[in-house]
Every structure is written in structure tokens, then in C-alpha cells.
Amino acid sequence: SGNWSVTVPASAVSALGEATYSVTASVTNAQGNSSTASHNVQVNTALPGVTINVVASDDIINAAEAGAGQSISGQVTGAAAGDTVTVTLGGKTYTATVQGNLSWSVDVPAADIQAIGNGDLTVNASVTNGVGNTGSGSRDITIDANLPGLRVDTVAGDDVVNSIEHSQALVITG
């Protein structure tokens, strides 16, 4: 059939550095005729990197920011435009496409942030480059969407400032 195979030991493969190698095979038949074939193989084990920019300007999503949704963005290294970044936050997954300047961005809807609730959590991002190597990064953030409690008590005993009270100091409490 003309097919053949050889097993290269793992120790020999792992000893190869990052480079392009030529694999050459030769055969000689019983009549002394020989043939040689070569094929280039690239060794690329470098993992891409992913960074996540500061979220909500201080890594704390407050009530107003939670209500507006948030953009989570960052950069990659060792990847290329068109590669996909996968972001997880609060058990949900979002995807972004790496842009020409190696940046990426996902929009997290307000409903998703509000469903997570308050607390500390980690944003995780990963990217797989064109040769199948995967790198990841993370950033710790806090969701603090509790609105502060505030009340104003009844003013002037009846919420009406009369002519007598109008000429006096007025104490407002809450």
C-alpha cells in the first residue's frame, strides 16, 4: 500500500525547541531504487496571554453601573485578530472576537449582573490561538449594587411649614 509509520518517543518530541523542522523519510527497494520525501513541521508550544482591563473604573460595580450593564475588555498576546476570547462571569459565558489591535470586548447585560447579586467574584477569560494553544487570565471584581437606605421624617410635625415655623430654625431629621 505504500503507507508507513514510525513512533517518535515523547522525550524526543519534548526536547524540540520552538522552530520549524524538516521531517525526511527515505526508502530503497530491492532493485536499489530510492526515493526521499520531506515535510516541514512547526513546533509552537507558546501559550497566548489574556489580560482583563479594570471593570467599572474601580473593579466595583455599583447599583447605577449594574443597572446599565457593563463592558468587559482586555488584550491578548500570542493570538491573532479573529481568534475568539471566551469570558465567564457569574456562571455565564460570553464571547468576543480579537480585533486587529489585539483587543477584545464583551457587553454584559444589566439583567445578568443583577442576577449574580452582590459579592466578590472573578472574571475569567481564555483565548485559543491558531495552533490550538490556550491561555487564560482573570480579574477579581465586586458587585455592590445595594442602594443606601435613607428616609426623611415628617417635617414640622405635619409636613407644613406654617407662619410661626417659617420664622424659626427648622430641624429636619431622618
Regions found by a protein language model. Give the residues of each.
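Hydrophobic/tyrosine-rich beta-strand signature of extracellular beta-sandwich/beta-rich modules
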Residues: 25, 123-125
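Flexible, low-complexity linkers/stalks enriched in Thr/Pro that connect modular domains
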Residues: 29, 33-53, 129, 137-153
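Short, solvent-exposed loop/edge segments of extracellular or virion-exposed proteins
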Residues: 48-65, 148-165
